[in-house]
């Protein structure tokens, strides 16, 4: 293989947020019903990890299932509660008074915390969780992560963490404002949301 200039890509171990039951597990209310008829009805969230320049970078977005828009996200060098809180507050700031979205996640430790669940309750957000070890229960977010990593991470070298973080910001802007989708009638996620208002 070396003589042909071929290299093997080895996948690193995936980040696992599940640390057992450290708090309350919510039922799977979303139950793989990924269709929403209006903005802010159904949101999904998760955390993914990137190894960049001997560091780890964690991305945690919230996606609206109505138009697949990333309504809020946070980037951190460690998976911590403040990252979860930051992205949640960003999403809450976009809610209308009458909105009561379902927010679906896996059973990661941060989603089991009382302080996280209190923020949801205080803002009329209904918590939903995937069954343990079942990534298909959050397939839309897993699909987003997979596409993101193929398009801007795998096979690329970043010279610094800050360059990579900038590339993440640019990718999410591209996803929301430039990437058209046949499922959205040839519009971008932001155009589709604006068209529905």
Say what each PLM segment does:
Residues 36-71, 77-81:
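An active-site-proximal beta-strand-loop segment
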Residues 1-38, 134, 188-197:
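Basic, flexible linker segments flanking DNA-binding modules
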Residues 67-73, 127-130, 154-155:
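Short small-residue beta-strand/loop micro-motif enriched in glycine and branched aliphatics
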Residues 26, 40, 59, 80, ...:
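Hydrophobic (often cysteine-bearing) scaffold residues that line and stabilize catalytic clefts
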Residues 19-21, 105-107, 113-114, 129-149, ...:
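RNase H-like two-metal-ion nuclease catalytic core shared by retroviral integrases
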Residues 114, 121-125, 147-197:
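C-terminal domain-tail junction helix/linker
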Residues 1, 30, 46, 62, ...:
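Mobile genetic element proteins and their domesticated derivatives, centered on retroelements
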């Amino acid at each position: 293989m070396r003589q042909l200039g071929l290299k093997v890509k080895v996948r690193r171990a995936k980040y696992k947020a599940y640390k057992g039951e450290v708090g309350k597990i919510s039922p799977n209310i979303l139950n793989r019903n990924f269709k929403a008829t209006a903005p802010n009805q159904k949101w999904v969230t998760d955390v993914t990890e990137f190894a960049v320049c001997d560091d780890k970078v964690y991305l945690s977005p919230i996606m609206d299932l109505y138009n697949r828009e990333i309504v809020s996200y946070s980037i951190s060098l460690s998976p911590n509660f403040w990252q979860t809180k930051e992205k949640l507050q960003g999403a809450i700031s976009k809610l209308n008074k009458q909105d009561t979205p379902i927010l679906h996640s896996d059973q990661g430790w941060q989603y089991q915390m009382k302080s996280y669940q209190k923020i949801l309750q205080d803002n009329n957000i209904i918590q939903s969780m995937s069954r343990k070890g079942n990534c298909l229960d959050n397939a839309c977010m897993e699909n987003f992560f997979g596409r993101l990593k193929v398009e801007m991470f795998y096979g690329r070298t970043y010279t610094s963490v800050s360059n990579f973080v900038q590339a993440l910001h640019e990718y999410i802007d591209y996803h929301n404002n430039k990437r058209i989708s046949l499922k959205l009638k040839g519009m971008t996620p932001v155009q589709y949301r604006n068209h529905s208002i």
